[in-house]
Amino acid sequence: MSNSYLSFFVLSSILVLTLIFFFMKRKKTKFNLPPGSMGLPFIGETFGYLKPCSATTMGAYMENRIARYGTIYKTKLFGEDTIVSADAELNRLIFQNHGKLFDTNYPKSIAEILGKWSILTIVGDVHRELRNVSLNFMSYARLKTHFLKDSENSALLVLNSWKENCTIEAQSEAKKFTFNVITKQIMSLDPRNPETEELRDEYLSFMNGVVSAPFNLPGTPYRKALKSRKIILKFIEGKMEERIKRNQEGKKDLEENDDLLNWVLKHTNLSTDQILDLVLGMVFGGYETSSAATALAMYFLPGCPKAIQQLREEHQAIARSKKKAGEVELTWDDYKKMEFTHCVVNETLRLGNVVRFVHRKSIKDVRFKGYDIPCGWNVMPVISAVHLNPSNFEDPQHFNPWRWQSGNWASLNSNFMPFGGGAKICPGMELAKLEVAVFIHHIILKYNWDLVDVDDKPIIHPLVDFPKGLRIRVQRQPTLI
């Protein structure tokens, strides 16, 4: 009898497992996935995808896949099944449906470096709270006053240190410029203080590992980034403790009282770990993209003398107007007058692609143009592929700021997504544009410059980088105001 029951149980189990396998297979095969190749086991095509390439091209990998499969294809990246989108319409759908159809999904290795509470990787209610803090911090009211003033002061500090006919590593100077702005606003750091320079050095090591291969081995960029993270957090925590102590003692500093660190300590219930990850991430986000865009502007402009001439005329007119009015510092009205400068900034962001792609995942089954994106799959909107598609931008690899003049703006705007889009659009977008414009204002009035190494082209690695540091030779611009 027992043998009969045992046989019945075994046969029933086999039948159930067969049915489960059959229905799972049916469910799996019902999707009409985009074409593509899943590459090698586990790693897929990650190394090909991340292979360094020119920042002003899609790169050989993307060009090859688009030629073979079209602008939407499947692959495996970072160990996950992934739909890659070089399609502007799908990218807009992804950005505009955050939390409805798609959500943030950065690789575990990136989350480990940026932290559990990073605004970039976290989702849900805590993300909304942290994002509201960052949006309030980078509000238009602060841009018009605090950030504009510090951007100008930092630009002048950097540019006034240059000597006639000297060679400058422009990439390093751009990083110094934007780092000083963001750390002044977040922690009231003095750009002349050695501790600010030491912190910037740690951030350089940190950034190199954020998007590196996640090999936690001695000497790897990933291991160095984890080490730098600890040092940076220790520095920030030290500043927090100093601030808390001074607040308790009733000692107030007008500058410190208005920075981000003081605000979150006084007006939020965030934990120490949440504040540490927030500050770490906001310095990273407010520094890297802005510095890359500033360096790219210095790279593109010498190849376009007509743009330099038009910029010079625009900024000389602003300077003459200020001199006549007895004003010295730039105002928000001055910034709004920089119409052609805004065209140059947009074109720099489009062609330079400071943000190449973002990480998302589908939280529902999505059907688009006949293809299925299964729930749970990673989705990778590739921004650079949209910006460099001739269907979206005429002669896309040509630096042409005039394409952004008012008559053309509306037709280009829907395909322009340098900072992502939707609810997760970069909170520092307007700050980055402001910083580049202010830097252009002063460098155009003070200097002529040319590239020392014409072969030192920007590459994506996957952050924007100049292998030789973008060396430029500067000459003083005669004062014509």
From Swiss-Prot:
Residue positions binding heme: 426
GO biological process, one term: cholesterol metabolic process
Pathway recorded for this protein: Steroid metabolism; cholesterol metabolism
TM annotation in the entry: 4-24
Record membrane topology: Single-pass membrane protein
UniProt entry tagged with the keyword Transport: no
Keywords annotated in UniProt: Cholesterol metabolism, Heme, Iron, Lipid biosynthesis, Lipid metabolism, Membrane, Metal-binding, Monooxygenase, Oxidoreductase, Steroid biosynthesis, Steroid metabolism, Sterol metabolism, Transmembrane, Transmembrane helix
EC code: 1.14.14.-
Gene3D superfamilies, alphabetized: Cytochrome P450
Predominant place of localization: membrane
GO cellular component: membrane
Enzyme class, UniProt record, top EC level: oxidoreductase
Listed GO MF terms: heme binding; iron ion binding; monooxygenase activity; oxidoreductase activity, acting on paired donors, with incorporation or reduction of molecular oxygen
Position of the signal peptide: none
SUPFAM superfamilies: Cytochrome P450
Location of this chain's protein in the cell: Membrane
Domain of life where this protein originates: Eukaryota
Biotechnology: The coexpression of CYP90B50 and CYP82J17 in the yeast strain RH6829, which was engineered to accumulate cholesterol, leads to the production of diosgenin, the main precursor for the industrial production of steroid hormones.
Tissue-wise expression: Mainly expressed in leaves and seed pods and, at low levels, in flowers and stems.
Family: Belongs to the cytochrome P450 family.
Function description: Involved in the biosynthesis of spiroketal steroid and saponin natural products from cholesterol such as diosgenin and analogs (e.g. furostanol and spirostanol), plant defense compounds used as main precursors for the industrial production of steroid hormones. During the 5,6-spiroketalization of cholesterol, catalyzes the hydroxylation of cholesterol to form 16S,22S-dihydroxycholesterol and, possibly, the subsequent conversion of 16S,22S-dihydroxycholesterol into 16-oxo-22-hydroxy-cholesterol and 16-hydroxy-22-oxo-cholesterol.
Name recorded for this polypeptide: Cholesterol 16,22-dihydroxylase CYP90G4
Organism per entry: Trigonella foenum-graecum (Fenugreek)
Lineage of producing organism: Eukaryota, Viridiplantae, Streptophyta, Embryophyta, Tracheophyta
